[in-house]
Amino acid sequence: AVSQNIAYADVDGNIGLQTCAGIPIRIKGDGLMVVPGWTGEYEWEGIVPFEERPYSLNPSTGTVSSANNKTTDEAYPYHISYWYALHYRIDRIREMLNSKEKLTPRDFMRMHTDYQSAMAQDFLPGLLQVIHAHREELSPAEASALNLLRTWTGTMEAHEAAPAVFDHFYVTFVRNLFHDEMGDSLFTEYTRSSYLSRYAVDKIWKNHGGIWVDDIDTKGTEESLEDIIWVTFQDVVADLGKKLGKDPESWEWGKLHTLTLSHPMGSVKILDRVFHLNRGPYPAPGSFHTVCPYAYSLANPYHVNHGASQRHIYNLADWDKSYVILPTGTSGNPASPFYLDQTEMYLKGDYRQDFFSVDKVKETAKYVLILQNSR
């Protein structure tokens, strides 16, 4: 089964986070690469006992949180994985959790739809420094794009232009770093696994360079990180000008970054036309690096393929004051009024009440579905 971090809370005020996974105890290696299977030197010695798997119970911080991030430090004796999300989303989550002594359901609603990018705030100083060093060379469009970034707060709103410049810079930067060494086929496969390329980019940025920086297609020249940043920025302005028009102020992120809700049978065009199975594209805020994750593959940029499949806020003091919203609806039947009827609410950050008591469930039910054995 897929490994999970399970968050826990109960009516007595206890909270916890438990890693639920079969973590192998390896004689040798970390499971990342292909190894000889016939020598016995890479065998497993068993599974880490449940009591020794990472957990947190009633921590002194008063909160537990998880965003696909690494939950152990270097002292943890067992190797779990390299397959973690970068720290930016969990950093922002913890910043918001610590911002108030007491949090309300409305605060958690705002957290669910938070588009502030800690990654953008981390990358911007270095990016702006390089562009500023070339300020005498800037075209009018480049100067306008620079101004968008310079005055930006780092919030990935769909109606703003700066997010389009920033994320397109990131996507183009990944290509300019790796494509010359990898070529088309390997680069496509590499960027399908977004965690790998994101970790590599983060390390290169923080170390101010690395073996991938030099463009091997420019013979006799060894590029620095600053060279690649400058070339990438020029590429971005030229490319967005072709995609979204000549005026950088009109480069709204939601024109580039979209969400389409696709039915499993919606790929059959005649069925989609007749039954209106697919919906969208909708302009999408956020990104893979925001707490509200409208994420996309670097191999197919800006087409949202990952996000919150449900948003829940549970009130353990009064279960009937809990909240929920889905990106689609409670029915998979296109003829149902409950097919994709929550999408607009989901995109706006709105919620429905989520009832648990028998009386409230019966009172608010639209209909009752009874499944009977025919025998």
Residue locations for each model-derived region?
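C-terminal/peripheral segments of proteins
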Residues: 1-134, 138, 147, 151-375
